[in-house]
Amino acid sequence: MTIALCLTLTCCGGEGGSQAEQLALDIRAEYLEMAGCTASMEVTADYGQRVYDFGVDLTWQREGESALTITAPENVAGVTARLAQDQAYLEYDGARVETGPLDDTGLSPVSSVPVLLDYAQTGYIAACGLETLGEREVLRVDCRDPEAQPGTGRECALWFDPDTHALLRGELSQDGYTVIQCTFSDFQLTPGAEG
C-alpha cells in the first residue's frame, strides 16, 4: 500500500500538494482498507445504438460474494447478478444461470462496480480537483493509463463527497466516449479489520 500511495503522490505533485490532492490520497487509503460497501445506484450503459438505464442495489465484498440486484425497470426487477472471484452468474427466483468468468477486457453494467472500485483503490490519478456537482462541492478524480493521452483508451472519472468520502458518481469511458455512468446514493463503506 505504501508504494501505491508514493506513486500517487508523484502524479499529484508530491509534498505540499493541494487540498484536493491530499483528499484524493486520504480517500484512496480508506478505499484500499475497506472490507466492502453498500449502495443504491442508477446505471446508464451506452452501447452507441442502444442505451439502457437500470436501478441497482449493491452489496460489494472484498472477500466472498458480491451482489447487484436490479430494482428498475420493473420488468427485470429482482434479477440479481452475483460476483465471486472470477465467476459471475445471474439469479432470479431461485434459478441460477452461469455466465462464465468475467472477461478482463470486457466491460458490462455488471462488472462496472468492481472496475470503478479498482480505479478508486489503485488507478493512476491523472488529475483531481474540487468542483460543483449539482449544488454541492465534490472531489473529482480522473484516472487513466499514465502512458495514454487524454481521450484514448479506457478512462475513469470518480466523484466523492469530500466530507464522508462516499462515492457519488463514476463514469467509464472508452476512447473519449462515456459508456457506463453510475450515480450512487446511500453509499456506505464497511471498514476493514484495521479501520
Q: What do these predicted ranges mean?
A:
Residues M1-A4:
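Sec-dependent N-terminal signal peptides
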Residues T8-V56, W60, E65, P191-G195:
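N-terminal leader/targeting segments and the immediate start of mature chains
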Residues A29-Y31, V56-Q61, A81-R82, G123-T132, ...:
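Short, exposed beta-strand/loop patches in secreted or surface proteins that constitute
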Residues L32, M41, A45, L90-Q149:
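Flexible, processing/modification-adjacent segments and terminal tails
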Residues C37-V43, Y52-I70, V79, A88, ...:
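One face of beta-strands
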Residues D46-V51, P73-A77, E147-T152:
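Short, cysteine-centered beta-strand-loop-beta hairpins and adjacent loop/turn segments enriched
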Residues W60-S112:
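An acidic-aromatic
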Residues T69, A127-G195:
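Gly/Pro-enriched, hydrophobic low-complexity segments
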